[in-house]
From Swiss-Prot:
PANTHER family: IRON-SULFUR CLUSTER REPAIR PROTEIN YTFE (PTHR36438:SF1). GO terms for molecular function: metal ion binding. This is Iron-sulfur cluster repair protein YtfE. Homodimer. The keyword NADP does not apply. Di-iron-containing protein involved in the repair of iron-sulfur clusters damaged by oxidative and nitrosative stress conditions. One of its GO terms (cellular component) is cytoplasm. Keywords: Cytoplasm, Iron, Metal-binding, Stress response. The lineage of its organism: Bacteria, Pseudomonadati, Pseudomonadota, Gammaproteobacteria, Enterobacterales. It comes from Salmonella paratyphi B (strain ATCC BAA-1250 / SPB7).
Length: 220
C-alpha cells in the first residue's frame, strides 16, 4: 500500500522519525492519527509526492523500537516514566516562564498574550487526565480487563482531543511557537521548551491512541 493511503498514526509507528516529519508539516498524527497521509497533505497544502519521498528515505533507517510488539504493561510503565512524569516537570516551569515574559514584555506587539492562561489550563487538564489513567485505566489494562475498559478509554480519547485543542491555541498565540526577533533569552528558552513539550505530548497521545488503547480493547 502506498504511503499516501495509510493512516498517519500507522506511519508514525512504523517509520523512524516520521513523527518529527509530520510535526514539521504541522500534521496531527496523534489525535488525528486515523486520517490518511493524502488527506493530511491536502489539508495542509503539502505536495504528496515530496512527503512520500521523504518518508521513503526515513523508512530505510532501522526502527528503534516497535511498540506494537511490546507487552502492554511495559508500554504503560514507559508512558508513566517517559511522558507523565516529564509533563509534570515541564508545564510548571513553562507557566513560570510565560508569566515572566507576559509581564516584562507586556508592551511588545508580539508578546504571546494569554499564554500563561492556556498553559495553566493544559497543566490542569493533563494533571487530572494522567491521574485518572494511573489510578483507573492503567490498572484495568494491566489486570487484563482491557475489553471492559471501553468507557474509560473513550473518555481518555476525548480528553486527548481537548488537550490537542489547547495545544492549537498555544501554537496560535505563539505564532506557531516561533520567537520574534526581539525575543529575550527567557522568551526563546520558553519557546524551545514549548516545542519539546508539544513533541512529547504528541508522541504520548499517539502511543496511547494508536497502540495501547486498540490492543487493550482487543483483549491483549
Amino acid at each position: 500500500m502506498a504511503y499516501r493511503d495509510q493512516p498517519l498514526g500507522e506511519l508514525a509507528l512504523s517509520i523512524p522519525r516520521a513523527s518529527a516529519l509530520f510535526r514539521q508539516y504541522d500534521m496531527d498524527y496523534c489525535c488525528g492519527g486515523k486520517q490518511t497521509l493524502a488527506r493530511a497533505a491536502a489539508r495542509h497544502d503539502v505536495d504528496i509526492d515530496i512527503i512520500e519521498a521523504q518518508l521513503a528515505q526515513l523508512a530505510e533507517q532501522p526502527i528503534e523500537k516497535d511498540w506494537r510488539a511490546v507487552p502492554l504493561a511495559d508500554i504503560i510503565d514507559h508512558i508513566v516514566v517517559r511522558y507523565h512524569d516529564r509533563h509534570r516537570e515541564q508545564l510548571p516551569e513553562l507557566i513560570l516562564q510565560a508569566t515572566k515574559v507576559e509581564r516584562v514584555h507586556a508592551d511588545k506587539p508580539n508578546v504571546p498574550r494569554g499564554l500563561t492562561k492556556y498553559l495553566t489550563a493544559l497543566h490542569e487538564e493533563l494533571s487530572s487526565h494522567m491521574m485518572k489513567e494511573e489510578q483507573i485505566l492503567f490498572p484495568m489494562i494491566k489486570q487484563g480487563m482491557g475489553r471492559q475498559a471501553t468507557g474509560p478509554i473513550s473518555v481518555m480519547e476525548s480528553e486527548h482531543d481537548e488537550a490537542g485543542e489547547l495545544v492549537d491555541v498555544i501554537k496560535h498565540v505563539t505564532q506557531n511557537v516561533t520567537p520574534p526577533p526581539e525575543a529575550c533569552t527567557t522568551w526563546k528558552a520558553m519557546y524551545n521548551g514549548i516545542n519539546e513539550m508539544i513533541d512529547d505530548l504528541m508522541e504520548h497521545i499517539s502511543l496511547e491512541n494508536n497502540v495501547l488503547f486498540p490492543r487493550a480493547l482487543a483483549g491483549e
